[in-house]
Amino acid sequence: PEPLSYPTEPPLAVDFESLKAINPDVKGWLYIEALDISYPVVQGPDNDAYLHTTYEGTSNFAGSIFLDYQNRDDFSDGNTIVYGHNMKNLSMFGKLKQMKEQEKYRDSVYFWMLTPESNDVYQIFSAFYTEADSDVYTLYSGGGEAFVQYLNTMAARSEIPVEQPEMDEHSHIIVLSTCAASDTTGRFVVLGVRRNR
C-alpha cells in the first residue's frame, strides 16, 4: 500500500507567548485529531505537580496534560511520556480509550504536538492496555539498539490494526498514557512516531 501522506497543516494556531505568561511550565499543545482532544501540555518538577493542578495553577481534580518530569521539554528524547487523567466526563484523556474501544483510529491515526519552535505531527503505530510498571515507560534519550528493540516491542503489542510506519534509532515517539480505570494500576497507552522531521 502507498505510505500514508501525513497532514502538514496544523489544526490550530497557539499563542505560546500568552500561555507562557500564565505559566512558563507550558511546553506544548496536544491535539488528537480522531478524538478532538486539545490541551496545553505542561511539565512540572515531578509527576505529582500537575496531577490535580491546571496549567493556570488552580487546584482541580482533572489536573493537566503533562510531560514526564524526566523527559527533555523539547520532545527530543527517543520517547516522551505524556500523562492525562481518564476523566469520566471525557475531559483530559477520558476519550483516549475510544481509540481502541470505538475504533477511532479509523477516523485519523495522527496527533499533533505544537511547540513554540515547531508544529510536529505524529502517526499512531500502537495502542494497548498495560500496567503502571510496564516497560513502555522506560525512557530512552534516543538512539541505540535497545531503543530500536523497544520500538519493535511496543509496535508488536498494538491492540489496534494500524499501518506500521518505518522507525529506526533516530525516531522520536510520544507515549500518551492514561489510567484504564480509577481503582487499578492498569493503564491505556497510545504511541505515535514523529513524521515531519
What are these regions (language model features)?
Residues 1-197:
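Solvent-exposed, non-transmembrane regions of membrane-associated and secreted proteins
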